Each structure stands twice: as structure tokens, then as C-alpha cells.
């Protein structure tokens, strides 16, 4: 046991990783964490105030967080995605006079209800997917489903953001094109595969990467 403790102590406190040791790495990460919290907490507080007290109109952006937000099903995927995105996304939509309404472990029925309810003007979908669909917590939602519900809802006048892979699929139309009244406001990634770093970037910057890729893609049409 003493040998094990001694070895652990060596690797944590004495061994150098390049020109720095574990203690220096830990202190650096700790400092970064506190700097991030210094920004995150005030931004979250501001978002809560604007979303719940300042905005009066019942106009919403629905944010559908699938249980498959990262990889395989994980109950904590939705809460983690919420914590990471709440300040930036709420302030983004609040600046456009929309409140945010988060759906944890969102289902196919949640998506259908959002389409039908006219108070939802913008839609954000987080989870596995493609250009023709999105994997809700309970089942896959596709262009076929949206076309089946067409007579139940009016097209949305806000924005569509889909944080998922954007592989080519069965139909030429993106699923968002069937929902929104302006296809130029249907935002999705340009590559076949979208990584976690891309999701994180858009979570903390208010969709800047996705909007950049979409606008660049639209210019080449």
C-alpha cells in the first residue's frame, strides 16, 4: 500500500509532464474554471431576468434536447446541454423578443406539439440526426412525419437550428424547409458529421458557427 501511495504521489505532485507538472496543470484548469464561472453566472442571471420578467409577449423558441444529445442514450445529456447553452441561447432569442422553452429528453410527441402550437416561432433541435430527420428520445422523426402533420400547423416565421450531423438522406428538402416559411432561416452544419466541439461552440456563442456555415453555403447556391 505504501508503494502505491508513493507512486500516486510521485505522478501527481512530482512527475513533470513536459516542462510543467500536474499541480501546475491543476492550478491552471482551476483558474480557467473560475474565470468561466465569473462570466457564466452573471450571464445566466441576466437571461433568467429577461426571459421571465422583462419579456411579456407569449412568443417562444422551443429548444428540444434529445436524450441522444451526445452519443448513446444518456439521461444526463439534456441537463448538461441545458446548462451549457442556457445563457447564450436564451439571450440570443430574448434579443429577438422570444422567450425560450426547453424540453428535456424531448420526444416525437413534443416535437409534434411544438409544430402545432402557434406560440412557438423558432425551433432548436439537439441530438443525432441528418438533413431529413432527428432522433428524439423515443423515436426518429423524419420528413415523412412532418408531411403527415402538414395540415395541423402553419409554417413557422422564426428560425430553425439543428445541432446534429447533416448527412445527405432520402429527400432533397431539409426537414426544416418543411417547417419554416423562409428556408434561408433553416440553419444546419455543412459537413456530413458534426462533432461535440461544434455543438459546444454554438452553445456558448449563440449559433455563430452554424449561421456562418449556412450563410456561406447559401452564397454558393
Regions flagged by a language model, labelled:
Residues 45-47:
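Boundary at the C-terminal end of the N-terminal hydrophobic targeting segment
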Residues 68-71, 107-108, 128-133, 165-170, ...:
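Solvent-exposed loop/turn segments at secondary-structure junctions
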Residues 121-133, 176-186:
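Active-site microenvironments of hydrolase-like enzyme catalytic domains
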Residues 1-10:
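N-terminal targeting leaders characterized by basic, low-complexity, disordered sequences
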Residues 129-156:
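A short, glycine/acidic-enriched catalytic loop
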Residues 159-221:
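Active-site-proximal C-terminal subdomain of hydrolase catalytic domains
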Residues 15-38:
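N-terminal Sec-pathway targeting helices
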Residues 50-125, 139, 162:
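A domain-level signal for caspase-like cysteine endopeptidase catalytic cores
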